Amino acid sequence: MRLILLGAPGAGKGTQAKFICEKFGIPQISTGDMLRAAVKAGTPLGVEAKKVMDAGGLVSDDIIIGLVKDRLKQDDCKSGYLFDGFPRTIPQAEAMKDAGVAIDYVLEIDVPFDAIIERMSGRRVHVASGRTYHLKYNPPKTEGVDDETGEPLIQRDDDKEETVKKRLDVYSQQTRPLVDYYSAWAANGDPAAKVAPPKYRKILGVGNVDEITARVFEALK
């Protein structure tokens, strides 16, 4: 099972990625983790990437694709792999296709933006313990304070409505076009591609976690 998970920030990709990886016995591949590991190990690509990052630059797609190809040669990828948060752009998707990286499924978790804003902006956190609440779905017994300690809850900057809206804007401009790219490739094929087109599946990411997980596994049959 080789797949790419797509969806907006806050759509619940991380939760579903964990369930998919457990069910199919495959690793979750994160470009951030790969970069850190390559830099730490001092591989040729890691050294190159470190130079760019130390200079405050963005690591090129060529380096990222090189890291991906190296990562997929490792033993734990023999049964498949799951990409979460990659590719982010059409050029990265094209580079993956040109590099012959095979994908069986592209799964989009679709959640309306207003639901994501409500889901994320309603979160409140007790910093010391990491306990998380939600104003609507899991409120504290007393407004604004942690159930166990009575200490104040905070809203993380990442969860503030204006920040969530900005992240969704970036997603719409950069990553949302991947949905059209992969659905078109799945529907029409590409004779020039080195790999077969993936199957494209879209599921609704609204409801409780068990319902969404059931939809995910049904889509991957």
From Swiss-Prot:
- Please give the Gene Ontology molecular function terms for this protein: adenylate kinase activity; ATP binding
Reactions catalysed, semicolon-separated, are:
AMP + ATP = 2 ADP
Could you confirm whether the keyword Nucleotide-binding appears in this record? yes
A Gene Ontology cellular-component term: cytoplasm
| Residues given in the record as AMP binding sites | T31, R36, G57, L58, V59, G85, F86, P87, R88, Q92, R156, R167
Name the Pfam families on file. ADK, ADK_lid
* Residue segments, region LID: 122-159
Has UniProt tagged this entry with the keyword Metal-binding?
no
Alphabetically ordered keywords of this record: ATP-binding, Cytoplasm, Kinase, Nucleotide biosynthesis, Nucleotide-binding, Transferase
Family from the record: Belongs to the adenylate kinase family.
Q: What is known of its domains?
A: Consists of three domains, a large central CORE domain and two small peripheral domains, NMPbind and LID, which undergo movements during catalysis. The LID domain closes over the site of phosphoryl transfer upon ATP binding. Assembling and dissambling the active center during each catalytic cycle provides an effective means to prevent ATP hydrolysis.
According to the record's subunit comment, the protein's assembly and interactions are: Monomer.
Descriptive protein name: Adenylate kinase
